[in-house]
Amino acid sequence: MLFNHTPDELLRLCGHTLDLAKQSGATSAEADFSESLGQSVSVRLGEIEQIEFQQDKSLDITVYVGQRKGRASTADFSERALQDTVKAAIDIARYTAEDDCAGLADAALMATHIGDLDRYHEWDLSTESAIDLAKQCEQAALSTDKRIENSEGASVHTGHYQYVYGNTHGFAAHQQSTHHSISCSVVASDEHGMQRDYWYDSSCRHEDMDAPELIGKTAAERTLRRLNSRSVPTGSYPVLFDTTVAVGLIGHLIGALSGGALYRQSSFLIDSIGKQVLPEFLSLREEPHILRSFRSTYFDAEGVATQPRFVVKDGVVEGYFLSSYSAKKLGMKTTGNAGGAHNLYLNHTHATQADLLKEMGTGLLVTELMGQGVNTITGDYSRGAAGFWVENGVIAYPVQEITIAGRLKDMYRDIIGVADDALRRSSNQIGSVLVSKMTVAGN
């Protein structure tokens, strides 16, 4: 066992902490105990740059005294520390204002089935082996082409995590997961200047990742194809978001449908249940029980059971992403999304990105986005971009130093196709997305 505590030990600590909270005057309480450990190594130009070992543990206790809430945390699991942390949370609660929406999620909503989602796969990797993998990755990139003349480094990361959540409804559950990754970033140059790009892979199970040599070679190829980038004339064009950036595009939709933004009136999709936000041929599903996915879980951060569901069906919003608190604020029922969304799937209309390029004809393929020019209150969207200009369905040349702009509501409704090319490493399976028109500002 890699961890310092067994699952049973963490469950006992959690139950004991909740008992302390009740004995100290809490009306109700919830606690989570977590442990993590891992290592990260990075190399640059064949030399070791960094070796890090990480081992953490934490307790977060939230207490409710009537409708008052207090929260405290500690990294010390000793009896005295548990008592002091509970006391601190109780003291905080007594000085906070009452909140009618504060409290645990309903007991009837607690998860009753906690199965194995195959998310935990130890990688017993020595530091020397991790360094060798990073060097192999970087060397594969540097050997791809003589124009790859520098490196920002390659890295290997392993992470092992376990977590226990419990509350005074009597719910308590344990889950564990792993997260392993390999990445590489290099620089290429020619007579027109320099460009950089990167690639990585990650998985719960290290055997499922691409070989380090393939990751390095992909990083090099992505960098080389950016050489001799130029701008494009300002105008209105179709824009194809590569799958690597399409996840972020749909992420703005997820954020706008999230309870916190909705009850604070800081979303451009307020009161959107039953309204069309995507074309009729698109649906967005949440699938929280997918095996070996980083975001899979049978219960959310409040112990509420998670369920597969449509968030958007045939273009129409069917549900939000709600915790019990945001649900109470909105007069609704929690959707089991305390802690965020779980594995989103956007259906596809085309087999490949090449099919979407043909559909687009002439326009912009975006592979990188820069800046924070997204206003989630108004839905205004304006970001720096780089990618490729496309003519007659074929990539013509790389582009940079451009800005793409639009309104998210219009952009979502103007989607005309989604490719079946989502990356395996992503919890949100969103393929390349083609938008019929956006403003592109170039030279």
What does each of the following model-derived ranges do?
Residues 114, 270-443:
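Dual-mode signal for accessory low-complexity, basic/Gly-rich regions
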